[in-house]
């Protein structure tokens, strides 16, 4: 039998052996240190690193891996800015309040001074004076009538002027009335119910008998003899009114 016939008739085991040998030869060739092997190794390494989780790569870096330094600085800057803004608001506000308080104090002081000045000016611009046609003496004003009437009418006339029939409280006032009246007899405010009763003024205060009163009449008058005399109520005479001086304001 020829050699080719022997090869064709070889059992399947030999064919499997040849195929295995060829695979081992191919594997040895692919595992050699050529360029293709190096590239494959590098690709595998890159793929491995890219698949490692980010948190594991940064593991062990502590606070910096959670709060990076740039973020901490940013928070510090924010805090500084807020502090500066707060100071910029509070300081001017405090200054403004202080200025307003000073202004209010100044206004209050000025108002008080103005009130005091006004009060002083009011006092300085007032004076005691008597009405027109009245004569001033001491702290009183006197009116000497130019007409005549009975004692009752004379009393009512003086009351209508806010006064009373003349009253003297000192001898100096009496002497003034005597000099000023001239030679005529004038009704004054003395009266009594009868010769058995005391003399009184129109306000019913009792006369102090500074000067004795002559006559037996019920009403007193200043006589032309510079004395005080009495007469009947119906006799007509001129009269004298008296009242205290009042302070009046003087216009500027």
UniProtKB/Swiss-Prot annotation:
Membrane-side (Cytoplasmic) residue stretches: 1-78
Residue intervals of the C-type lectin domain: 137-242
Domain of life per record: Eukaryota
Gene3D superfamilies: Mannose-Binding Protein A, subunit A
Paired cysteines (S-S): 158-241
Family matches, as PANTHER family: C-TYPE LECTIN DOMAIN FAMILY 2 MEMBER D-RELATED, C-TYPE LECTIN DOMAIN-CONTAINING PROTEIN 180
The protein, known as: C-type lectin domain family 2 member D3
Native organism: Rattus norvegicus
Name of encoding gene: Clec2d3
């Amino acid at each position: 039998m020829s050699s080719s016939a022997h090869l064709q008739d070889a059992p399947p085991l030999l064919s499997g052996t040849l195929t295995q040998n060829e695979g081992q030869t191919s594997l040895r060739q692919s595992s050699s240190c050529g360029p293709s092997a190096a590239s494959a190794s590098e690709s595998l390494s890159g793929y491995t690193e890219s698949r490692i989780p980010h948190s594991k790569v940064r593991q062990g870096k502590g606070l910096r891996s959670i709060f990076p330094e740039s973020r901490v600085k940013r928070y510090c800057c924010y805090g500084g800015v807020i502090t500066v803004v707060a100071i910029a608001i509070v300081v001017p506000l405090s200054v403004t309040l202080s200025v307003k308080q000073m202004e209010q104090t100044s206004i209050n002081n000025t108002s008080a001074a103005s009130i005091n000045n006004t009060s002083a000016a009011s006092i300085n611009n007032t004076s005691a004076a008597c009405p027109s046609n009245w004569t001033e003496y001491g702290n009183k004003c006197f009116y000497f009538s130019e007409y005549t009437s009975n004692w009752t009418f004379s009393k009512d006339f003086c009351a209508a002027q806010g006064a009373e029939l003349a009253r003297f409280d000192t001898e100096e006032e009496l002497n003034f009335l005597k000099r000023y009246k001239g030679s005529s007899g004038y009704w004054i405010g003395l009266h009594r119910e009868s010769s058995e009763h005391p003399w009184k003024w129109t306000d019913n205060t009792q006369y102090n008998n500074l000067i004795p009163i002559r006559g037996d009449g019920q009403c007193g008058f200043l006589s032309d003899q510079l004395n005080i005399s009495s007469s009947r109520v119906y006799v007509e005479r001129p009269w004298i009114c008296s009242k205290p001086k009042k302070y009046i304001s003087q216009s500027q």
